[in-house]
Regions:
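N-terminal catalytic cores of NTP/NDP-binding nucleotidyl/phosphoryl-transfer enzymes
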Residues: 30-93, 146, 155, 215-217, ...
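Secondary-structure transition/capping motifs at alpha-helix termini
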Residues: 67-75, 96-109, 129, 133-138, ...
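Extended active-site and interfacial segments that coordinate phosphate-rich ligands
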Residues: 56-64, 213-249, 272-279, 289-295, ...
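Residue patterns forming the tRNA-binding/recognition surfaces of aminoacyl-tRNA synthetases
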Residues: 2, 7, 16, 20-24, ...
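Active-site-adjacent "gating/activation" loops or surface patches in catalytic cores
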Residues: 253-258, 445-475, 639, 643-646
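Feature 926 captures the class I aminoacyl-tRNA synthetase adenylation module centered on the KMSKS loop
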Residues: 201, 392-452, 456, 500-543, ...
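Non-catalytic terminal extensions that flank enzyme cores
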Residues: 1-53, 76, 332, 345, ...
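Short, solvent-exposed turn/loop segments enriched in Gly/Ser/Thr/Pro and often Arg
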Residues: 33-35, 43-44, 77-90, 143-151, ...
Length: 872
């Protein structure tokens, strides 16, 4: 048994213990046929990212589950890895080049990709090392990357497989375009933000001169692409003009008026301008009515096909067009109008709906199975309320745009023949056209959406499409831990991808957590200046303190507020456990964890309490109630074990009865070992360090069996009996504190009770913990002599001679002095309140405050008078 240092140094311990775990190969998952597998794949962080509090929260939850299952005898695989993060990484590297006075086009595609790989190799390991600092027990030997050969093979197989089934197609549709990132985005990558704007009401003259239409728009610049006006066929106001044409203001183009049920009669004027290339609904109407399509924005959101406005930025063009409309008499009125504007989830610039030829995943056939596995309970969401969120999205899902106009990512495996125009889609890099065998072919320049490869993560990381031993043993995985903000981005796509490619759901449980927010409830971010660096928190307080802080008080699906002060409190908790462990070790003469044959009342009490705790914590962990489990362990260690049982054991440890001493030692060690095991998944470093220092049955705590409820250690009667003794101790302590009696001043305690056997057994503990000179247990009907202080619990009357507690004359003088002061204060307040001028003229809040002070003074006087009466 080694000695623990006087002061706990988390930094020294964490480095040493993590290396011990690595050297022992404890994180490695074996395919053991005699064990049940338990698998979690880590949500892959961006390859060039660094750890933020969201990661720390997400990874701590996963590590707790993995450590719990590992200790519970499962063959646990926590598979780590990182994402190539197409847009994010390309932007980072382009910023670097910009600082060097270069662009990616200066380098060319291959040269730029060399730069990105160099960037990845330089910064890619940073977040891995930070995850290790946090204590993550991942199987680092199985680490994956979404662009490695294994994942790339899975991406190719999936793309070609789905293309051959008609589930992936290339088509001309309205997509979301980010002019800043210069790429298409999927619907899930668009964040809608309410922004103040205007509603411009514009005259569209009828071509035959018989009148005009008034049309309202929030985007006058898109008028340049108008190719029609639509009204509702049931709208009586416009039935006579359907089939006519009107003149497009400023442009002079004649455009048809069509009837379509898409138009809402009660919105605006009931007339809607049709811009098929820049609105998804207009596009659908145009398809039904054969309207012309005119694209008026280029990839940088500058005007094209717009006459004199060509080359203008979209917002510059808006201003110019509004001025021209007003000057030429087309502008009727302008109203303030707030509306939702689509923005890029990555750069937060406004996105443009644009007609474009892109690659899409046909979602309707895939959604059916993805809906079924959730509705049938094969995949469960925790909390259950997120099932509705998922299903609502899946029932209304649109085809997924998967092509991105980037260079970094999985390039689309399609080659175009320059001779015959045929497109070849292939699992291997094509060298010739499959139709005419010409070698004059060129690969599609676009790459796949990052989320396409991420959607395959649960099975591509295990070797799919090859039939590997890992895939056979560890798949499907068990739990996916993620935030509610990426249910659409990632969770839904993993489910339908897995169902399609492996014919199995990728996991059985989706554990949804909330976001980490600042103390005011605001979302944390660098730009807002309220972000907290988890590595800085680890440097200040230790990884265990950070982990325990972000877990305690948290519940699945709910946001949590982060307070730095709580990290300090959790460090203090670690210190309390450390000091308690040192105390046990300094008093330990046994070298095994066996319980004594004879258990005294406090022993049965603490063992029964611990036994209940073990059962409850298991139940909480199995229900993913990690915050509740952590709080229960905290309360038991701080209150039950440290503040009560250690103090109760001191009498036997310092006594002359060798058997009683050994019994206390064994129970202290047994419970300490148990709480180290219960706490280990939450605070792995300090628990492993202490475990290695005390007598232990396993080579490492990380693989020690997790405590279970044991019927043999359930002592409900003794537990209840000892709670009566504890109630008495608390009551005596409270009364002594009220009377300002120092602990050093002893006084006899008489216990009048019907539970005589219980209190006779508990008398030594009352004497030690309630500063009693002696304890006498008498019948419940005992009549107290004059001059006794009486405290009552629901099972006993506790009597103490007043004279033994305090100097009666000095206390009487002190109380009289305070009473005189309180009466003078009350007299002044009542005089003030009797002044009609004060009551009628002073602000109501001031008068109420004065009345409140008067009531408090009355209560104080009553208490002081009661105390004086007790003194006699």
């Amino acid at each position: 048994m080694k000695e623990l240092p006087k002061v706990y140094d988390p930094h020294e311990v964490e480095k040493k213990i993590y290396q011990m775990w690595l050297d022992g190969n404890y994180f490695h998952a074996e395919r053991d046929p005699d064990k049940t597998p338990f698998t979690i794949v880590i949500p892959p962080p961006n390859v060039t990212g660094q750890l933020h509090l969201g990661h720390a929260f997400d990874e701590t939850i996963q590590d707790i589950l993995i450590r719990y299952k590992r200790m519970d005898g499962y063959s646990t695989l926590w598979l780590p890895g990182y994402d190539h993060a197409g847009i994010a990484t390309q932007i980072k590297v382009e910023e670097k080049l910009r600082n060097e006075g270069k662009t990616r086009f200066d380098l060319g595609r291959e040269g730029f990709l060399d730069e990105v790989w160099a960037w990845k190799n330089k910064f890619g390991n940073r977040i891995v090392e930070q995850l290790k600092t946090l204590g993550c027990s991942c199987d680092w030997e199985r680490q994956r990357f979404t662009m490695d050969d294994t994942c790339a093979k899975a991406v190719r197989e999936t793309f070609v497989n789905m293309y051959e089934k008609g589930l992936i197609y290339k088509g001309h549709r309205i997509i979301n375009w980010c002019p800043h990132c210069t790429t298409a985005l999927s619907d899930a990558e668009v964040e809608y933000v309410e922004k103040p704007g205007h509603l411009w009401h514009v005259r569209y003259p009828l071509s035959d001169g018989s009148g005009e239409l008034i049309i309202a728009t929030t985007r006058p610049e898109t008028m340049l692409g108008d190719t029609g006006v639509a009204v509702n066929p049931a709208d009586e106001c416009y039935k006579d003009i359907v089939g006519k044409t009107c003149i497009l203001p400023l442009v002079g183009r004649e455009i048809p008026i069509v009837a379509d049920e898409y138009v809402e009669m009660d919105f605006g004027t009931g007339c809607v301008k049709m811009t098929p290339c820049h609105d998804p609904n207009d596009f659908e109407v145009a398809q039904r009515h054969g309207l012309e399509e005119i694209l008026i924005l280029d990839n940088n959101a500058k005007i094209i096909n717009g006459g004199k406005y060509n080359g203008m930025d979209r917002y510059e063009a808006r201003k110019a067009i509004v001025e021209d409309l007003e000057r030429e008499g087309y502008l009727v009125k302008v109203e303030d109008y707030s509306h939702n504007v689509g923005t890029c989830y990555r750069c937060h610039n406004d996105v443009e709906p644009m007609s474009s030829e892109q690659w899409f995943v046909k979602m309707e056939p895939l959604a059916k199975e993805a809906i079924r596995v959730v509705e049938d309970g094969e995949v469960k969401f925790v909390p259950e309320r997120f099932t509705k969120t998922y299903l609502n999205w899946m029932y209304n899902v649109r085809d997924w745009c998967i092509s991105r106009q980037l260079w970094w990512g999985h390039r689309i495996p399609a080659w175009y023949c320059k001779d015959c125009g045929h497109m070849t889609v292939s699992r291997e890099d094509a060298t010739e056209c499959e139709h005419c065998h010409s070698r004059n072919i060129e690969q599609d320049p676009d790459v796949l959406d990052t989320w396409f490869s991420s959607a395959l993560w649960p099975f591509s990381t295990l070797g799919w499409p090859d039939k590997t031993a890992d895939l056979d043993y560890f798949y499907p995985t068990d739990v996916l831990v993620t935030g509610y903000d990426i249910i659409f981005f990632w969770v839904a796509r993993m489910i339908f991808s897995a169902c399609e490619q492996t014919h199995k759901p990728p996991f059985h449980t989706v554990l949804i957590h909330g976001l980490i927010r600042d103390p005011q409830g605001k979302k944390m971010s660098k730009s807002a200046g309220n972000g907290v660096d988890p590595i800085e928190m680890i440097d200040r307080f230790g990884a265990d303190a950070l982990r325990f802080n972000i877990i305690t008080g948290n519940s699945p699906g709910n946001d949590t507020r982060f307070y730095v002060e709580r990290c300090e409190a959790m460090r203090n908790f670690a210190n309390k456990l450390w000091n308690a462990s040192r105390f046990v070790m300094m008093n330990l003469n046994v070298n095994d964890c066996a319980l004594p044959e004879r258990l005294e009342l406090p022993d049965k009490w603490v063992l029964s309490k611990f036994n209940t705790l073990a059962g409850e914590v298991r139940e909480n962990l199995d229900k993913y109630e990690l915050g509740i489990a952590a709080q229960k362990i905290y309360d038991f260690i701080w209150d039950t074990y440290c503040d009560w049982y250690i103090e109760l054991a001191k009498a036997r440890l310092n006594g002359s009865d060798a058997e009683a001493r050994e019994g206390a030692e064994r129970v202290l060690l047994y419970v300490l070992t148990g709480i180290l095991k219960l706490l280990h998944p939450f605070m792995p470093y300090i628990t492993e360090e202490i475990y290695q220092a005390i007598p232990h049955e396993c080579e490492a705590l990380i693989i020690a069996p997790y405590p279970k409820y044991d019927e043999a250690l359930s002592f409900p009667a003794e537990e209840q009996s000892f709670e009566l003794v504890m109630d008495a101790i608390r009551a005596i302590r409270s009364r002594r504190a009220d009377m300002n009696v120092p602990p050093s001043r002893k006084a006899k305690v008489i216990v009048a009770t019907a539970e005589k056997d219980t209190f006779v057994s508990g008398a030594p503990y009352i004497q030690r913990l309630a500063s009693a000179s002696e304890v006498e247990v008498v019948d419940a009907g005992y009549e107290a002599a004059p001059g006794m202080v009486t405290v009552t619990t629901h099972s006993a009357r506790l009597l103490m001679p007043m004279a033994e507690l305090i100097d009666l004359e000095a206390e009487r003088a002190r109380l009289n002095k305070e009473l005189e002061k309180a009466r003078k204060q009350l007299e002044a307040q009542e005089k003030k309140l009797a002044n009609e001028s004060f009551v009628s003229r002073a602000p109501e809040a001031v008068v109420n405050a004065e009345r409140e002070r008067a009531e408090k003074a009355k209560a104080l006087i009553a208490n002081l008078e009661g105390s004086l009466k007790e003194l006699g």
